Amino acid sequence: MLFRSGAHIISIGTVSATLVHPREVFKFAILSNAHSLLFAHNHPSGDAEPSRDDIELSRRLKAAGQLIGIELIDSLITGHDTFTSLTERQLI
């Protein structure tokens, strides 16, 4: 689903996991002629701390974006009334 703001739902998962492939993340960025991308997802638990998988995926997205010329600006994790920026934490 593409939103008017340019936001797009890539995957809907379960309470504890979802599958995300960089190809799907960048598909709509490429089709939209985007030069940058902000990746965001939620943790239904409400804890916005990044998991090892969150960090690994974000690093893969950053590397993929560098290859195709679309900058990953940040990877955000939302929780209950809070969020975590992996860029701010220097994790990507």
Feature map (PLM): residue ranges:
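Hydrophobic structural segments
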Residues: 5-8
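Active-site-proximal loop/helix of nucleotide/amide-processing enzymes and allied scaffolds
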Residues: 11-92
